[in-house]
Amino acid sequence: KNIKNNNLRNNDILLISDVNCWDLILDKLNYPIEKGVITLIKFTIRFAIQNRLKIKIAARSQKNHFYNENIFYKKNLTNEEYRFLLKNIFFRSKNYKTYEIMQKSKITIGTMSTMLRENLYMEGKTLACNFTKTNIFDFPIKGICSLNDNDFDKFEKRAKKIISISKNHYMNLINKKPAYLVFRHQYKNTIDLVKMKLSYHLGLQEND
C-alpha cells in the first residue's frame, strides 16, 4: 500500500528519543524500560529504511551533553542502525526547532515525551508506543494514537495507516479530543504552544 504525501508536511517521521528520561528509581523495580525505548528506536529506523521515508530523530540531549546518550545508542544499536541514527539526528536547542520539525512531520513517534501530547494539540498525528511493560507510560488517549504491543508488523501497519489517512480521519479514531491533554496537564508552556499554533497557521496562509 502506497503512503500518501502531504505537501505541507515535508518530513515523514519525527522520532522523539526518550533515552534516559525516566526516573532511575524505576530501574530498581526491574521494569524493562530501557529495552522498550530501544525497541521503539529500532522499529522506527527499520520502518523508515524499508519504506524509504524521510526521518528526523530528536536527540534527548543538547549537542554538548550528548556523550551518555551516544554511548546508549552505541551499546544497543547495530552498526547499520547507529550510522543511520547519526545521519538523521538533530540536537535539542533553546528555540522551537523540535516543534517546527514536528509541525512539518506526517507522524510523530515516541514513548513518554510530552511533545507527543502537544503534537496532538497542534493538530499533528502522534503514535505513542509504550513497549516498557509498565502502564506508567501509557498514553492518556486511546485509539489509533497509541500502541503497546511491541510487534514490528503491527507497528508498521499502524504507522503506515496514520501517515496515509487524513487529519480528520485520524482525529475520529481517538477517544478524546486533543485539548483534553493540554488542560488536564496544565503545561507551563501552553501559552507558547498556542502562539506557535497560531504562527504556524498564519505562515501557511501567507504561503498559499
Regions found by a protein language model. Name each.
Residues K1, S17, A59, S93, ...:
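Residues at the C-termini of beta-strands that transition into short coil/loop
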Residues N2-L77:
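Conserved catalytic-core segment of nucleotide-activated headgroup transferases in glycan assembly
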Residues L14, K56, I107-I109, L127-C129, ...:
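Hydrophobic/aromatic beta-strand patches that form the interior of the parallel beta-sheet core
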Residues P32-L40, K154, Q186-T190:
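Soluble or luminal CAZymes and related metallo-dependent hydrolases
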Residues F43, F47, R158-K161, L173, ...:
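Charge-rich, solvent-exposed alpha-helical interaction surfaces
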Residues Q62-M122:
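Donor nucleotide-activated moiety binding/catalytic core segment of transferases
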Residues N79, T114-H185:
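Catalytic binding pocket for nucleotide-activated donors in carbohydrate/polymer assembly enzymes
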Residues F183-D208:
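C-terminal alpha-helical cap of glycosyltransferases
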